[in-house]
From Swiss-Prot:
Homodimer; non-covalently linked. It is found in: Secreted. Its main location: secreted. It comes from Demansia vestigiata (Lesser black whip snake). This is Venom nerve growth factor 1.
Length: 242
């Protein structure tokens, strides 16, 4: 009897020793490990998707340089705006470089802006040019190329003039050929050659309208604007001289 009990106990212990080990020691590639790997991949995919959605809802702020570049971008102009001859004027020039001194290469300077024009008006001609026929100019004038940022249109309203024009990925500057009086009184009595005993006189700058490319918001369009184009003499009869 005791031999039978010992046999049963030994058989029971051998059966326990031969039983499978716990899942902690399951070899790689077993169902337990595959489930863990699939769960990890699913979590990673979910995290990436969430990150992309977050980036789309809250995009990263642009750099200051990019914002400045965007704000300074020129308005792109349709080349068709330049195809109509009625918009062309000999006093308006679009160029990538400063224009020549003048159309006849005489007595014209290039200045950066209107302030420079007012500070530094000078001419390459003599103050009182004399030709072979002994002809004199009643008023002395100076002609210059200028850039304008603002002007007055034909309706008397202020408009913004385009300085830089983006045309076919090339940036052109808009220049205006202006003529102004050099001095309101070229001689002490006023205009040169006027009989001061009977007439009051002085020189003044007159304006004309030219077509210029202007902008309103992000739109470019042609408008008539005033620019200085001539220097003339104005006379009036002195009181009592009839």
């Amino acid at each position: 009897m005791s031999m039978l009990c010992y046999t049963l106990i030994i058989a029971f212990l051998i059966g326990i020793w031969a039983a499978p080990k716990s899942e902690d020691n399951v070899p790689l590639g077993s169902p337990a490990t595959s489930d863990l790997s699939d769960t990890s991949c699913a979590q990673t995919h979910k995290a990436l998707k969430t990150s992309r959605n977050t980036d789309q809802r809250h995009p990263a702020p642009k750099k200051a340089e990019d914002q400045e570049l965007g704000s300074a971008a020129n308005i792109i102009v349709d080349p068709k705006l330049f195809q109509k001859r009625r918009f062309q004027s000999p006093r308006v020039l679009f160029s990538t470089q400063p224009p020549p001194l003048s159309r006849d290469e005489q007595s014209v300077e290039f200045l950066e802006n209107e302030d420079a024009l007012n500070r530094n008006i000078r001419s390459k001609r003599e103050n009182h040019p004399v030709n072979d026929h002994g002809e004199y100019s009643v008023c002395d004038s100076v002609s210059v190329w200028v850039n304008k940022t603002t002007a007055t249109d034909i309706k008397g309203k202020p408009v913004t003039v385009m300085v830089d024009v983006n045309l076919n990925n090339h940036v052109y500057k808009q220049y205006f050929f202006e003529t102004k009086c050099k001095n309101p009184n070229p001689v002490p009595s006023g205009c040169r050659g006027i009989d001061s005993r009977h007439w009051n006189s002085y020189c003044t700058t007159t304006q004309s309208f030219v077509k210029a490319l202007t902008k309103e918001g992000n739109q470019a369009s042609w408008r008539f604007i005033r620019i200085d184009t001539a220097c003339v003499c104005v006379i009036s009869r002195k009181t009592g001289n009839f």
